[in-house]
Amino acid sequence: MLKIVKKLEVLMKYFVPNEVFSIRKLKVGTCSVLLAISILGSQGILSDEVVTSSSPMATKESSNAITNDLDNSPTVNQNRSAEMIASNSTTNGLDNSLSVNSISSNGTIRSNSQLDNRTVESTVTSTNENKSYKEDVISDRIIKKEFEDTALSVKDYGAVGDGIHDDRQAIQDAIDAAAQGLGGGNVYFPEGTYLVKEIVFLKSHTHLELNEKATILNGINIKNHPSIVFMTGLFTDDGAQVEWGPTEDISYSGGTIDMNGALNEEGTKAKNLPLINSSGAFAIGNSNNVTIKNVTFKDSYQGHAIQIAGSKNVLVDNSRFLGQALPKTMKDGQIISKESIQIEPLTRKGFPYALNDDGKKSENVTIQNSYFGKSDKSGELVTAIGTHYQTLSTQNPSNIKILNNHFDNMMYAGVRFTGFTDVLIKGNRFDKKVKGESVHYRESGAALVNAYSYKNTKDLLDLNKQVVIAENIFNIADPKTKAIRVAKDSAEYLGKVSDITVTKNVINNNSKETEQPNIELLRVSDNLVVSENSIFGGKEGIVIEDSKGKITVLNNQFYNLSGKYISFIKSNANGKEPVIRDSDGNFNIVTENGLYKIVTNNLSDKNEKEKNKEEKQSNSNNVIDSNQKNGEFNSSKDNRQMNDKIDNKQDNKTEEVNYKIVGDGRETENHINKSKEIVDVKQKLPKTGSNKIMELFLTVTGIGLLLTLKGLKYYGKDK
């Protein structure tokens, strides 16, 4: 209040110069009037600032509209696809696609000045990140130097590291000493090539680190004996099996493990290890808290580079798996069981090196940030990660995470598994080349993600459940390759496949003569969700066959497919027949008997005119309530008319209807969001712009006139 009074005094001195004036001479009532005028004049400006900066409803609704439109735009999805391919981390690629379209955190479109500011902020952030990265590198080097200085060096225990002398015993002695607490439990391998001619046994509370130029060379060439460099349990020198006790807290970092499996000239055996049946790097059984990172694995012979059985809390991070030698004598049924990383329960059949047969599951296993491809000596890997065995006596491996890896031209699959529970396959990149560009090629085809079922006709078990396949990129050039396959492979098999989610994947199918669907879902028992996938090219988009229970197919987008976009198929005495047939243009899914969720998927026609029309409609998630059984929509014209009717009824509202069976009747629940109508922001906000200046001018003028009149009046009286 005092500040306002002083400002008014200054103003009066301007209008009545050369006189001593004090507003304190005015009556209280007059002062109140002046203050009221001033406050009223500024109220519009203040309220405008408040509403403009903090109108949560308007901002939220406009944000939802813009975000929905962009998320469903085919153009954005194409940009998203391109960005994800260019990025090593596909998850980051998806996130960055939004910033390309200039969307702020609250969903509003930024102005050019805001973009400039963002560029500056980005530069500052990038600088800070680079600084942080350098600091991390320096810190890592310091830690590494301290590790080297305090750890037990294998050369101090007699290792030579020339690739000729057998260094196995020296390495084992160093590990045994570290297990007793010497060197802080740390073992260091300086630069060199360390030949080992027998298995090295890892011990609890030990940490092995290799110089980046250090290599472990497998020289185990014993008939009927595992040729595996490191094991967490005991396996006697005479080949006798023992029951493994538990091990824990083991880490291995850096360097290269050469499994020495490159083939001889005839292509029938391992050139340097002719007596072995297979070669590998790690057998991890009955263990807890095991970490393997920054390791290069080269040239396994037939077998698994890493085998994980009955173990928990296992991490494989930032590693490379290069090359798998396959003899010409191998049959297809043998080949497809050769995963580079195998994850399985602890059984004698699955893990034959030990007598443990309790079926203990593997859990909390993460494979991330790694590359899988071919080497100079051997061809591509068969399957990067997975398993091929499961029985009733075992527990399902659970909480398996496969994140941000690159699977480069796998022969059979990037990920293939059976009997898994709680699986997340996210942010990976899968590339599949044509036969002419491949060393190893399977004529029967491939599925880059293959959740299949083990042949079980006696055991009732859950085959695969709670599986999420999300935000991956698939680049397919081979006509015999599917991107994603989730299946119970035979109706005669016991057990269920359920709770499957396939979402936000981008499939780029460039094969000119493709023979396979991009996504195949076979005999899923319940809770199947296929949503927000973008499929570019190929023959068929999504095929769902002989599946039941709750099925949701939502907001998928298709471009330049030569066949059907979405097919629901069931088998009967006459063979297979479609429950639903789609057609060119917009297609509305109507599931068998109207039991499942009914939504619209945005489809792209083969010409640009249709694509542009679909882009305009892409933010709709329309509902079709069909009482027909086995309804079929074969006319694209009818489909578009139905869409137009629904659009007119809904008036900027989005609704999804989920049908479910209750007894003999059908119950409807509106369980997904009803978006509010977007408010007209211009009508809701106060006047802005030039009106602000006018209000301010009138306010100042009014105050000036009143003060002048009152001041002159009292000036006369004082005289």
Curated annotation (Swiss-Prot):
CC annotations in GO: extracellular region
Entry's transmembrane regions: none
Disruption outcome: Cells lacking this gene adhere to and invade human cell lines half as well as wild-type bacteria. They grow less well in human blood, perhaps because they are more resistant to phagocytosis.
Coiled-coil regions listed: 601-658
Membrane topology classification: Peptidoglycan-anchor
SUPFAM superfamilies: Pectin lyase-like
Pfam families, sorted: Beta_helix, Pect-lyase_RHGA_epim, YSIRK_signal
Applied value in biotechnology: Has potential use as a vaccine component.
First-listed, main subcellular location of the protein, grouped into a coarse class: secreted
Biased composition (Polar residues): 623-634
Record field: compositional bias (Basic and acidic residues): 606-617, 635-655
Motif residue range(s): LPXTG sorting signal: 685-689
Domain of life: Bacteria
The PbH1 repeat ranges on this chain: 287-310, 362-384, 397-419, 497-523, 525-546
Species name: Streptococcus pneumoniae (strain ATCC BAA-255 / R6)
The keyword Ribosomal protein appears for this protein: no
Role summary: Acts as a fibronectin-dependent adhesin and invasin. Binds host (in this case human) fibronectin, plasmin, plasminogen, and human serum albumin. Where the bacteria adhere to human cells there is major recruitment of microvilli which seem to fuse to cover the streptococcal chains. Antibodies to this protein reduce bacterial growth in human blood.
Propeptide: 689-719
Region (Disordered): 56-76, 109-128, 606-655
Protein name: Plasmin and fibronectin-binding protein A
Location relative to the cell: Secreted, Cell wall
Residues with Pentaglycyl murein peptidoglycan amidated threonine modification: T688
Stretch forming the signal peptide: 1-45
Keywords: Cell wall, Coiled coil, Peptidoglycan-anchor, Repeat, Secreted, Signal, Virulence
